[in-house]
């Protein structure tokens, strides 16, 4: 079984594992947005990254860290984080990959 583990923050990452062995590790694909060049998830790059690391028909699961609002984070910051989390869910749905959520320890 192949597992794609995702830490959904913009500074997060993606790990591809198979049979308890790490095959690849990637930084979260991001791109600049707006006049201030703030970072946002590059969903198209995420799709490409996932497709390059799987074969359709393989037994694959995506595991995403499920995080909640954190004290001290602003509304805008949490909204942007939610957008990234939702985009990751959308990419997995579009690729028809089963997605599971785990709480951070």
Question: Each predicted region: which residue ranges?
Answer:
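Phosphate- and other anionic-substrate recognition elements at nucleic-acid/protein interfaces
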Residues: 1-105
């Amino acid at each position: 079984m192949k597992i794609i583990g995702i830490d959904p923050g913009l500074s997060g990452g993606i790990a591809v594992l198979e049979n308890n062995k790490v095959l690849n590790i990637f930084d979260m694909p991001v791109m600049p947005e707006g006049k201030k060049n703030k970072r946002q998830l590059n969903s198209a790059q995420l799709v490409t990254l996932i497709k390059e690391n799987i074969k359709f028909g393989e037994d694959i699961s995506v595991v995403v860290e499920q995080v909640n609002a954190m004290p001290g984070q602003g509304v805008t910051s949490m909204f942007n984080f939610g957008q990234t989390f939702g985009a990751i869910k959308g990419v997995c749905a579009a690729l028809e990959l089963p997605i599971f959520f785990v709480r951070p320890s």
